[in-house]
Amino acid sequence: MRGGMGNMQKMMKQMQKMQKDMAKAQEELAEKVVEGTAGGGMVTVKANGQKEILDVIIKEEVVDPEDIDMLQDLVLAATNEALKKVDEITNETMGQFTKGMNMPGLF
């Protein structure tokens, strides 16, 4: 029985360390900034690791009052690219904590 309690305490310490490490990794992710671009760099969207849009940069020459739809499409494409990159770095960073566990959609 004693060995079981020792193992339980060891497992609890490991879980606490993992929680602490995960929290630190999430803080680091929040500080990372990724960019998504569209139209050959005519539109750039910057997002952080928490999927917050930080900046939208639109080059003047892409603004055509006659073709707002194109500009909207470029902003949408750049935003989606930035968010996809956030997902990639999140999965890469947080994946180290879930190796071997089947937890789809956790992050």
Curated annotation (Swiss-Prot):
Listed Gene3D superfamilies: Nucleoid-associated protein YbaB-like domain (3.30.1310.10)
Gene Ontology cellular component terms for the protein in this record: bacterial nucleoid; cytosol
Bias (Low complexity) ranges: 8-17
The organism's place on the tree of life at top rank: Bacteria
Localization in the cell: Cytoplasm, Nucleoid
Pfam family, one: YbaB_DNA_bd
Assigned keywords, A-Z: Cytoplasm, DNA-binding
Cited SUPFAM superfamilies: YbaB-like
Region called Disordered, residue ranges: 1-24
Keyword Ribonucleoprotein annotated: no
MF-aspect GO terms: DNA binding
Family of this protein: Belongs to the YbaB/EbfC family.
UniProt function note: Binds to DNA and alters its conformation. May be involved in regulation of gene expression, nucleoid organization and DNA protection.
Subunit record text: Homodimer.
Protein name: Nucleoid-associated protein YaaK
